Regions:
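Short gly/ser/thr-rich secondary-structure transition/capping motifs
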Residues: 7-12, 78-82
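A generic structural signal for alpha->beta connector loops
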Residues: 24, 58-59
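Short active-site neighborhood of thiol/selenol oxidoreductases, capturing the structured segment around
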Residues: 2, 8, 15-37
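Thioredoxin-like thiol-disulfide oxidoreductase module
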Residues: 56, 62-96, 101-108, 123-130
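A short acidic/small-residue loop/turn micro-motif
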Residues: 115-118
Length: 131
């Protein structure tokens, strides 16, 4: 599920539980490209795509849409009918975007609230050397 105009299928190919079970590090981003109040979610998802181009052989990239019904919201043109995804409640996220770098043991080694640029994420990947 994504509110992105042209979603990158690689960001939706992996499930967090499966990635962690297979001992692969994960770059996980919670955002809503089509409905982001800060207007940074679309660019954040674009950065995930650029990083996936470079690191998808060693890291799983996962985008989680904030809303469970973005298509309905788009069709109706009504933000107020948006229903937050259950995982957003479980992670207790009250803002967006959020990006987490999780190692192969399931430990969050870095987290970023709000927009994070590609250099900061790459620095985290290199510093945490989980590959």
């Amino acid at each position: 599920i994504s509110s992105a105009i042209d979603p990158d299928p690689r960001l939706y190919a992996n499930d967090l539980v499966d990635s962690l079970s297979s001992k692969r590090p994960v770059l996980l981003s919670f955002s809503t490209p089509g409905f982001c109040f800060t207007k940074t979610c679309g660019p954040q998802v674009d950065i995930l795509t650029r990083l996936a181009d470079k690191y998808s052989n060693i890291i799983d990239f996962i985008h989680v849409e904030i809303f469970e019904n973005p298509n309905e919201m788009l069709l109706e043109g009504d933000y107020s009918i948006g229903r937050q995804s259950e995982i957003v409640y479980l992670w207790e996220l009250t803002t967006e975007p959020w990006t987490f770098y999780i190692d192969e043991n399931g430990v969050i080694v870095d987290r970023f609230e709000g927009f994070v640029n590609i250099d900061e994420i790459e620095e985290s990947i290199i510093t945490n050397r989980i590959y």
